[in-house]
Amino acid sequence: MYNPKSTIATEFICDSEIRSTMRYAREYCDNMELVHGILDKARAFKGLTHREAAVLLECDDPAVGEQIYSLANEVKHRFYGNRIVMFAPLYLSNYCVNGCVYCPYHAKNKSIRRKKLSQEEIRAEVIALQDMGHKRLALEAGEHPLMNPIEYILESIKTIYSIKHRNGAIRRVNVNIAATTVENYRRLRDAGIGTYILFQETYNKANYEALHPTGPKKDYAWHTEAMDRAMQGGIDDVGIGVLFGLETYSYDFVGLLMHAEHLEATYGVGPHTISVPRLCKADDVDTADFENAVPDDIFYKIVAIIRIAVPYTGMIISTRESAKRRERLLQLGISQISGGSRTSVGGYVTEEAPDDNSAQFDIADHRTLDEVVDWLLSLDHIPSFCTACYREGRTGDRFMTLLKNGQISNCCLPNALMTLKEYLQDYASPVTREKGEAMIKRLLADVPNERARAKAAEYLERIDKGERDFRF
């Protein structure tokens, strides 16, 4: 029985409700009165139910599609302006006991070189990331109780936060590790993590169990209920996502939105972020073995509808996607991207030898962080290295309240400009610096609150003189 407030996986992600929704969408997708009513609701920035969103996904009218794309861009700018948050993944270890058939880290893969970073190696990786200009990391590790216990993760977080190299500092560590206990989530909270991220992979229980034949991850309920335990452990900000291509896209699209609705209904705050990775090639993984690949046109539509259905959430796209695709996705609601990424263990300090194969997936966007920042500036996006909300305690429902009532721009715009200024001063190429300085000068006047605008101008001058780490 479907119950969005239940904490039982098969009740808040109810297979019969998903299938009923898919049937409803197929039946009513050509009802233009209904479709335009749904678009009007989205245009009022009220979000959409999973059933309403499914109707839009199923509707193949070109004019409706164009309205969806235009509206996604409008919604993104309403809540997040033209800011794009920058981050990088940091892979600590690829030791893993699970048998996920779509991931090269699976325990039976003998061709991959297993690696685990020591604390000194983590220090070197973090310095390399700081020297690029990064301030926000997404920490990644395989699931292995002996090689990657929670104590190793906690020690690594402490190490990362402790490193201050030149003007560099990692100010927010997000964590993407396997589902764990309420007590361990409390320990992660106490370690000062930002967002806890866990991808569902697929919401189809039968398919999930087939794709995860061995290891602790094979337990569908344990994995699917992880965000509930994280919330119960005091983690305010959680990030969800599916790996599109493992299941029919319509099924996982509906399941993903139901998960967001469940968190909002049960805890009063929905997902801080939604990620939309697509299955891609990796060592010992051939995408031809999976029949549910999502073509670009459908993928773009999925991203756009998620944006209008869950308008408050941050939406993330990684270097799995090419520069060309990422440019299109920025127009459809994406608000966070990675740049200069390495998906191998230890890949920031030393370029991996071809025979090592320690990467989780092959990246499609190989540009440096400076090239990505320059590209964003050329597209009139603000590359933001801001971590202020997390550090000021604006998390969970406090962040969402500010976001939904439109007050966040008095914080986010000046913070974005100040962190961009830091990047330009410390790390940017001359061409990027010139573009960025022109943007800061132009956009400072857009800070809505006069006092905040004056204070931001003062802080920008002080950054020019060598001071760092101002925030609203």
Regions from the language model: what does each represent?
Residues 1-37, 41, 327-335, 341-472:
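Radical SAM enzyme core and accessory elements
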Residues 40, 47-84:
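An N-cap/entry alpha-helix motif that binds or orients negatively charged groups
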Residues 88, 126, 154-161, 185, ...:
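Generic structural signal for well-ordered alpha-helices
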Residues 107-124, 128-231, 236-240, 244-246, ...:
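Core AdoMet radical
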Residues 141, 195, 221-285, 295-324, ...:
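Conserved C-terminal portion of the radical SAM core fold
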Residues 211-217, 288-292, 358:
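Short glycine-enriched, charge-decorated loop/helix-capping segments at active-site entrances
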